């Protein structure tokens, strides 16, 4: 049973270097499943780019290099790990977030999150004065601003959203921005020279050149079946003669259907049919009689966003 991620190491690292150069001052984001590589694999690469790294939650801080300053992107909930490294920077976007830090005894540095059209975390212009006052009263120290536009939308739209904030906020603090391409970041720096604008980059950095990586699983077994038979967890009825192909990847790896319930598995550039939805560590595929059938030991391509996949093995070639 294997879900294998293969990476062309030199080409991948060349992409990292090119991306970092294009963005200028940036903070690599290493969060969640580590963009398919795992957080432990990406942290040393992030340290080559910047002395600061961004993680998704306060529970991911422990993965960051000891010498790094770590920005936590998501506000802290009811559990605040103790102790946190002194170079940790937390994020607040509401009075509730500040109260949570206060109750947890946090008096360290914070970044103020500003609302974007995504309407996730972040203070509005009207809420900002009270939030700043609450941060001061709690004994925390503001060290920056943050704006997180949505993924969708034109670059110009995202620049406009951030520009509105840049016209209002104190330029003595850096502002950290996400989901902007390098050109947009450089344009903002040109338009607002008094501000220090720092790009936070995750997907575009680690996964920006998909040609450098491939995701495969192996065929573990096959079963010849006749029309009318049943198979699988749900006793799915077989509509025609063919072969059930068992591959070593499933929901435990984060592998699911794509688009409109399409199979994520491909063999010899042909999409393979799912007999039933993937389950845990195995997916059951069906190949009608007469088609070239994958055999035990063959590798099957897996079409999945790496942001949700957990590979069993990573081959750095």
Language model: regions and residue ranges:
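Active-site anion/phosphate-binding pocket segments in diverse small-molecule metabolic enzymes
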Residues: 3-9, 13-16, 28, 33, ...
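Active-site-proximal beta-alpha core segment in soluble small-molecule metabolic enzymes
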Residues: 3-14, 24-168
